[in-house]
Structures are given as C-alpha cells and as structure tokens.
Amino acid sequence: MTNLNYQQTHFVMSAPDIRHLPSDCGIEVAFAGRSNAGKSSALNTLTNQKSLARTSKTPGRTQLINLFEVVDGKRLVDLPGYGYAEVPEEMKRKWQRALGEYLEKRQSLQGLVVLMDIRHPLKDLDQQMIQWAVESNIQVLVLLTKADKLASGARKAQLNMVREAVLAFNGDVQVEAFSSLKKQGVDKLRQKLDSWFSELAPVEEIQDGE
C-alpha cells in the first residue's frame, strides 16, 4: 500500500454537476456532510494546507462539486454540503439530485467519507448518503467531527453508539472520531485513503458480475 503525500494535493476544478466533471477514470474518494459538519476543515487538516478547501461562515455556500488531485489519477472530491435550513427547498432538491447522481453513476468513485458533528450524528440525509453508497457497493468512512467538543467518556459513548447504528446498513462502513483542531483521527483518515487509492477501480468486476 502506497503512503501518499496529501500535502501535494491541489485544486483542479469546480463543477455544477456530474456532467461537467473530467473523464470518469482513475480513483476518486468523495467527502460529504451537512453544511456545518466541518468538511472543509477536515480537508485542510488532511492536506496540511490552511486554505485548500475554503471554509465559509455561511453554511450552504459551497454548492459546487470541487475536485482536488493528490497525484495523477487520484482525486479527492468535495461534494456540496447538504441539509442547511436556510437554503431554499428547490436548491436543496437540486443538490440532493447531484449528490445521488454522483454516488450512483461515477465509476471511479472508490470510497465515501461522510462527516457528521459528533454531537448530532446520523441525521436523515447522513443516513441517505450511507445508504446510497452501500447500495452502490462503495466503502464508507464516517468521521465524527468536532470530537474535541466532548469529554473523553461522552466521545467514546457517541463513537460506540454510531458504530452500533451503522451495522444496520449491512455494508462496509467504518466509524472514527475526528478533530481538525486537535488533529485527532487524521492518521486513520490517511490510512483509509491510502488503502482506497491502492485498490483498482472495480469497474470490470461489476461488469463481469452482471
């Protein structure tokens, strides 16, 4: 398994939907989460760059699919944040269509990182994202972000509760606590990404099994 240098990650492009993404080849790992789940902070912490992914004081501002390249043919995909109350209903539906379309149709997608505030995990849309991924045979890493906001005992209790809950999806779903502030869980995230990026995209296997 190759240990990739995530500090080399650089921005490639933004796209309004899957049709505007570059060719569907190589390996992609997508990051998804509610608009206030700390997705941008996690990407910046992973890559040790302060402003790779722009953090916004206004949740719901990031409406585009943002692509970052780690090395040639290996990309991180920052999906639009979802579930923010003040976003108009039509825009919410548009985002959800874009997210669903990407998860179901993108052949180069190898893994999905779903970020949730450890204090408010497994909201309806979080569960929908995991369900979509499992149904598409995509491995999932759930990061319970802002873990530094809870004392050690409460943090472990939340982690165990979510680990128990995701068993119901009957898929490959791993759960870890994460804190951008304290750099907690960053090594686990890098290890998971390294393993995903080391795998061959499973396109042929899917076609052979049909």
Swiss-Prot record:
Domain EngB-type G: 25-199
A molecular function GO annotation: GTP binding
One Pfam family this sequence matches: MMR_HSR1
Magnesium found in the keyword field: yes
Ligand binding (Mg(2+)): S40, T62
Key words of the record: Cell cycle, Cell division, GTP-binding, Magnesium, Metal-binding, Nucleotide-binding, Septation
Function: Necessary for normal cell division and for the maintenance of normal septation.
PANTHER family for the chain: ENGB-TYPE G DOMAIN-CONTAINING PROTEIN, MSS1/TRME-RELATED GTP-BINDING PROTEIN
Organism superkingdom: Bacteria
Cofactor(s) the record lists: Mg(2+)
Family label: Belongs to the TRAFAC class TrmE-Era-EngA-EngB-Septin-like GTPase superfamily. EngB GTPase family.
Name of the featured protein: Probable GTP-binding protein EngB
GO biological process terms held by the UniProt record: division septum assembly
Residues at which GTP binds: 33-40, 60-64, 78-81, 145-148, 178-180
Gene Ontology CC terms, in alphabetical order: cytosol
Organism the protein comes from: Salmonella typhimurium (strain LT2 / SGSC1412 / ATCC 700720)
